């Protein structure tokens, strides 16, 4: 598993309202990307809190959907309007199969060569008063050699990102992440 990460604050802000984490529990690799609502320090704090809580619950033994449901309930009970979008990838390192859960998150992309498939769901972020019966399940993935999964936040324009991914050629994950961020600054 190879990762590339890049984050930039909105319009020159020194703080980015996004946060991410990558960790392993037994044979499962988890990748989390959260986008706090708003910009700057407040958004960053919301995103980092979501990451911290989800990571703690998953490493304690909760299944990913259960951890997300608990985070949703916590935000609803707290009722302070602070919330974060969630991209949560759970990938079995032995089989390369996994689930991608998206709550309120910008689209993700699966790239192989010049082919790009957009992945998105209609679930709102946790804490917006939506019960589990209105949440969509995750998207099942079976990753193949040479495929790249790209997770983005709403700071990256969809059309520009898709175009870049179709035409960028073979890049390392780090180079690809830098190119995706460049799409945001050019738009």
Locate predicted features.
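Short flexible coil/turn linkers enriched for glycine and charged/polar residues
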Residues: 11-13, 25-27, 80-82, 94, ...
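Catalytic core of PPM/PP2C metal-dependent serine/threonine phosphatase domains
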Residues: 1, 44-113
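Short hydrophobic-aromatic micro-motifs
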Residues: 29-32, 100-101, 149-152
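PP2C/PPM family metal-dependent serine/threonine protein phosphatase catalytic domain
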Residues: 2-17, 68-78, 106-140, 172-173, ...
């Amino acid at each position: 598993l190879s990762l590339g990460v890049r984050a930039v604050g909105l319009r020159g802000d020194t703080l980015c309202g996004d946060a991410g984490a990558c960790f392993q529990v037994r044979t499962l690799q988890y990748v989390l990307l959260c986008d706090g609502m708003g910009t700057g320090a407040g958004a960053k704090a919301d995103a980092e809190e979501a990451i911290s809580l989800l990571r703690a619950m998953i490493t304690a033994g909760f299944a990913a959907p259960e951890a997300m449901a608990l985070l949703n309930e916590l935000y609803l009970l707290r009722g302070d309007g602070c919330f974060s979008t969630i991209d949560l990838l759970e990938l079995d390192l032995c089989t390369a199969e996994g689930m991608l859960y998206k709550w309120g998150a910008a689209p993700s992309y699966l790239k192989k060569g010049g082919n790009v498939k957009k992945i998105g769901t209609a679930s709102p972020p946790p804490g917006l008063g939506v019960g589990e019966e209105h949440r969509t399940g995750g998207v099942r993935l079976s990753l193949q050699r040479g495929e790249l999964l790209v997770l983005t936040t709403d700071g990256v324009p969809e059309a520009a990102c898709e175009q870049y991914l179709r035409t960028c050629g073979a890049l390392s994950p780090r180079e690809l992440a830098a190119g995706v961020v460049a799409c945001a600054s050019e738009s």
